[in-house]
Amino acid sequence: MGKKGKKEKKGRGAEKTAAKMEKKVSKRSRKEEEDLEALIAHFQTLDAKRTQTVEAPCPPPSPRLNASLSVHPEKDELILFGGEYFNGQKTFLYNELYVYNIRKDTWTKVDIPSPPPRRCAHQAVVVPQGGGQLWVFGGEFASPNGEQFYHYKDLWVLHLATKTWEQVKSTGSPSGRSGHRMVAWKRQLILFGGFHESTRDYIYYNDVYTFNLDTFTWSKLSPSGTGPTPRSGCQMSVTPQGGIIIYGGYSKQRVKKDVDRGTRHSDMFLLKPEDGREDKWVWTRMNPSGVKPTPRSGFSAAMALNHQTLFFGGVCDEEEEESLAGEFFNDLYFYDATRNRWFEGQLKGPKSEKKKRRRGRKEESEGGSKLACGGAGTQGPVQVVKEVVAEDGTVVTIKQVLAAPGSAGQPRSEDEDSPEEAGSSAPGPCPRSNAMLAVKHGVLYVYGGMFEAGDRQVTLSDLHCLDLHRMEAWKALVEMDPETQEWLEETDSEEDSEEVEGAEGGDEDEDEDSREESGAED
């Protein structure tokens, strides 16, 4: 009895500390948010000029990360919304909506009146109601210099059948945040975690909210048991038994003034209704067997075949006294909730290329690209480990599966139906973090993300797919060469604070002009 009382008292103390920190962060960030709210309002004024929905064929979207890639519940389409891009001097944020037609291998830009404000690191969930709905909550907006942040707490729904945006206002919603996770569970949305940051302070969350899709009301859950510590960037999925898995994530703590210590979480928890009651939930810590991923942050997840959860990529940053070493990944892992077991994704390779691999490995050992990121029509996969050392001592290790150069991609035949059959055979997505994943008809799609080389951030715009039924080889649907992406060095000039509209996106024409000036790939 005494032990239980101590635990409850300790729990209440932690809640009070978190409440004080949230109040402190809120107070210090209020002025920043007021400044950014004016900027957001300016962009919303520009968006308000749209009076009708316009759908236009377009090239693939520009490089970005921390966007959302969702599967249309009724059509063979992927829906890309939002995201961010940094060119070394300015941060660009987007509220563009793109649709990728899987069968036709084409992109369409959909301009809809009164869209959500520009954002990244939000969450988007698709439900089948009413011909399909895309629900978007939270995310963040950044100043052009990337030093101030505004965290949204708004909820939007895109009605896919009518192509209209609607903001849904309801009391009791979660506080403003980004890096949270959200899933559809029965006729509810369930949201977990995230973080809120101002210039000097930050707070991470481990709270759980539900949004009822019938009554349009928020409720905060208070699960029993010991759940995850506060974190953002974790992964969240629904099990076949109706539970919800929380895995991994990232958080940091201040150890002394101006010194923070980050933690990459690799634990797993199960959240499920207690005794079948939807108003009472319980946390349980999980200890899966099998080969689990190495600790990392910035990894991505999607629901795969047989209700398994698929994990891809990420980065492991090792902080030392005078350097920061980052290792990026492009590996695949599967978690089977039915067996509570991890599996490492291994590709079989195309049957027709097995005899050519030995030669491919020999040729690959003779050279490789400094910033290689896949390639069309190559054969003979081999893993290459590269280290890039910057002037400041930063070491970035990139592990990549490359293929022998010199093989031209085969042209698409007229009788091919889908891009996963027609795309060029490639070694797959290069190592990256913060990529966007989606699975449709048993095919995994990986879009965008980023990796670092010294002080340079390379933002990606490539699109790859992998047939999860066959697990043979990746197909490159959209390619890019990171070498061609210009990086602008930091400057002490105050010119960055000018031309705010270009820095944050403006309208589409202004976006394209700004990216062309910065050398960014479209």
Curated annotation (Swiss-Prot):
The modification Phosphoserine is found at S413, S418. InterPro entries: Kelch-typ_b-propeller (IPR015915), Kelch_domain_protein (IPR052588). Residues 11-24 have a biased composition (Basic and acidic residues). It comes from the Eukaryota. Keywords: Kelch repeat, Phosphoprotein, Repeat. Pfam families: Kelch_KLHDC2_KLHL20_DRC7. Residues 1-33, 346-378, 402-432, 481-522 are annotated as: Disordered. Coiled coil: none annotated. Residues 1-10 have a biased composition (Basic residues). Kelch repeats lie at residues 77-129, 133-187, 188-241, 243-289, 308-361, 443-494. PANTHER family: KELCH DOMAIN-CONTAINING PROTEIN (PTHR46063), KELCH DOMAIN-CONTAINING PROTEIN 4 (PTHR46063:SF1). This is Kelch domain-containing protein 4. It comes from Pongo abelii.
